[in-house]
């Protein structure tokens, strides 16, 4: 399964073989036009570093307004940004629809902080986005996520879940409408691939040259690393 990286260093992600890189937007409406200028400078810098065709995405983490998001998308068009993610809070359906109506070639994605299939139905019916991004561990688990994927398929909308490692992978491997997986680069300098769950699992699958290979083991294909598990109580017991 192909994987893209969420990272602070798209150049390292490309070197490690990932099929694209998503980086955080550093400035928002509170910083005004000076912040916008710095945002575009960063986009321009990363485009020059990784080359013309390498997929670049931007994560806005629900921090923008409708006018700001529209301006950002328009000013990013010369730099071939693949998508702009989560520009608004999750239930701002009317705002998302306005942005979608005004934006050109850049894809709009959202859904990480949407928690029910009824919310995802609203995103779809109001034409709020080009890609849905449910988090498997937040939206109701595997059963609910399957319903969301099926719902999205009726609108010809792909689903690229928010990164949750094996939980996302085993959903996505079953559906052709889930074209790529997200991997969160957790190493301090963003220069290494490390386990998303730390030492929790013995055999968590990790990307290799931009792909994750899953096994046919039962369940999610991983086992708890019991030697690393210790009980920590938030309050001391008498």
Labelled PLM ranges:
Residues 20-22, 85, 133, 160:
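Conserved beta-strand positions in the central sheet of alpha/beta enzyme cores
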Residues 80, 91-211, 215-218:
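Shared catalytic-loop signature of beta/alpha-barrel
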Residues 6, 59, 86, 161-162:
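Active-site-adjacent beta-strand anchor residues
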Residues 1-57, 61-63, 70, 74-78, ...:
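N-terminal capping/lid subdomain adjacent to the active-site entrance of alpha/beta enzymes
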Residues 27-36, 60-68, 85-93, 115-117, ...:
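Short, small-residue-enriched loops and turns at beta-alpha junctions
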């Amino acid at each position: 399964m192909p994987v893209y990286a969420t990272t602070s260093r798209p150049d390292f992600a490309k070197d490690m073989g990932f099929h694209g890189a998503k980086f955080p937007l550093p400035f928002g409406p509170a910083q005004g036009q000076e912040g916008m200028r710095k945002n575009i400078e960063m986009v321009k810098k990363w485009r020059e570093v990784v080359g013309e065709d390498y997929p670049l995405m931007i994560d806005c983490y629900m921090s923008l307004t409708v006018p700001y998001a529209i301006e950002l998308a328009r000013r990013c068009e010369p730099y071939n940004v693949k998508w702009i993610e989560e520009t608004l809070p999750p239930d701002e359906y009317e705002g998302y629809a306005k942005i979608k109506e005004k934006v050109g070639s850049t894809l709009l994605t959202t859904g990480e902080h949407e928690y029910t299939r009824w919310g995802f139905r609203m995103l779809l019916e109001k034409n709020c986005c080009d890609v849905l991004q449910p988090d498997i561990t937040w939206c109701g688990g595997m059963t609910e996520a399957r319903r969301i994927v099926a719902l999205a398929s009726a609108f010809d909308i792909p689903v690229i879940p928010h990164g949750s490692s094996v939980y996302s992978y085993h959903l996505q491997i079953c559906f052709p409408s889930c074209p790529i997986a997200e991997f969160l680069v957790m190493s301090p300098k963003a220069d290494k691939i490390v386990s998303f769950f730390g030492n929790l699992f013995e055999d968590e699958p990790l990307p290799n040259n931009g792909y994750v290979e899953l096994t046919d083991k039962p369940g999610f294909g991983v086992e708890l690393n019991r030697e690393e598990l210790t009980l920590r109580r938030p309050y001391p017991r008498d």
